[in-house]
UniProtKB/Swiss-Prot annotation:
GO molecular function, one term: aldehyde-lyase activity
Catalyzed chemical reaction(s): 5-(methylsulfanyl)-D-ribulose 1-phosphate = 5-methylsulfanyl-2,3-dioxopentyl phosphate + H2O
Keyword Signal: no
Name of this chain's protein: Methylthioribulose-1-phosphate dehydratase
Name of the encoding gene: mtnB
Note on cofactor: Binds 1 zinc ion per subunit.
Pathway membership: Amino-acid biosynthesis; L-methionine biosynthesis via salvage pathway; L-methionine from S-methyl-5-thio-alpha-D-ribose 1-phosphate: step 2/6
Keyword Lyase: yes
Organism this protein belongs to: Acidiphilium cryptum (strain JF-5)
SUPFAM superfamilies (UniProt xref): AraD/HMP-PK domain-like (SSF53639)
NCBIfam families given in the database record: PRK09220.1 (NF006672), salvage_mtnB (TIGR03328)
Family assignment from sequence similarity: Belongs to the aldolase class II family. MtnB subfamily.
Pfam short name (any one): Aldolase_II
Enzyme Commission no: 4.2.1.109
Keywords for the protein's UniProt record, in alphabetical order: Amino-acid biosynthesis, Lyase, Metal-binding, Methionine biosynthesis, Zinc
Amino acid sequence: MTLAAGPAEAGDVLASRARELVAIGARMDARGWVPASAGNLSARCTADSIAITRSGVHKGRLEAADIIEVWLDGTPLRAGDRPSAETQLHCQVYERLPAAGAVLHGHSVAATALTLADNSPGIVLEGYEILKAFPGIATHETRIVLPVFDNDQDMRRLAAAIAPAFAAPPIGYVLRGHGIYAWGEDVERCFWRLEALEFLLSCECERRRMR
């Protein structure tokens, strides 16, 4: 029989996730992926809850108190806490992908500019050695399409537009003029995949500039 974590244990889990997200926020900031109050970061706490950044905080200067816990419907466990405006998109990933342990979202120059310059519904990534950074890919002779969705301030409508993509889960997706959403089994592996995606989009920007 599996016993539910008691308050002390639950608090320890949130504190651990907060330390991880504070550290990752600083690394993302060092890369220029989370300017001003941009981006949002989360990690799974339990089967039914996640730790996520508060709304409106700079991700490069996070403190433990900036990480709060919410249920998978986005409701904060503690009254008065205000999670990221995009909490619903994080919750969608955890609900659709039970193996996901972390979700990271940034606003890089490459992801923003590339998707505004091209109105296509996806970015083709082919022939890159770094594609092998993603699960199940063993050769550069691979072609994948990174989905791009039009940005929308209505999170319910945006989540509904994204939902069909999880029928065959992509390695991540991009919101047009906004940024990448990436996920992984834990915070470190999620960062690894975000880093690979950011590198690939930077390469695509350079290729198009050189044409």
